[in-house]
Amino acid sequence: MARVTVEDCLEHVDNRFELVMLSTKRARQLATGGKEPKLAWENDKPTVMALREIAAGLMDYAVIAEAEIVEDEPLFAAFEDESNEAV
């Protein structure tokens, strides 16, 4: 297993706070099984895999935000009905 350092990850994000927030969101996606890893899973925990993806430059806020928008779309489909009639 390759060791992931904070310095490797900071080359792709602005600061440590962003790194924590980004890696948390990505690890949660991986842990819940909703998203597939972008690297080969080498018996790593979701947090390590998230950091490996960030260090490789495969994950940033744009990718996370895009995934969240796609997940939210079905929730708002019910509100697109244009009828305002009382039930």
Swiss-Prot record:
It holds the Pfam family RNA_pol_Rpb6. Coiled coil: none annotated. One of its GO terms (molecular function) is DNA binding. Disulfide bonds: none annotated. One of its GO terms (cellular component) is DNA-directed RNA polymerase complex. It is an enzyme of class 2 (transferase). InterPro entries: DNA-dir_RNA_pol_omega, Pol_omega/Rpo6/RPB6, RPB6/omega-like_sf. It catalyses: RNA(n) + a ribonucleoside 5'-triphosphate = RNA(n+1) + diphosphate. Belongs to the RNA polymerase subunit omega family. The RNAP catalytic core consists of 2 alpha, 1 beta, 1 beta' and 1 omega subunit. When a sigma factor is associated with the core the holoenzyme is formed, which can initiate transcription. Promotes RNA polymerase assembly. Latches the N- and C-terminal regions of the beta' subunit thereby facilitating its interaction with the beta and alpha subunits. This is DNA-directed RNA polymerase subunit omega. It comes from Pseudomonas syringae pv. tomato (strain ATCC BAA-871 / DC3000). The lineage of its organism: Bacteria, Pseudomonadati, Pseudomonadota, Gammaproteobacteria, Pseudomonadales.
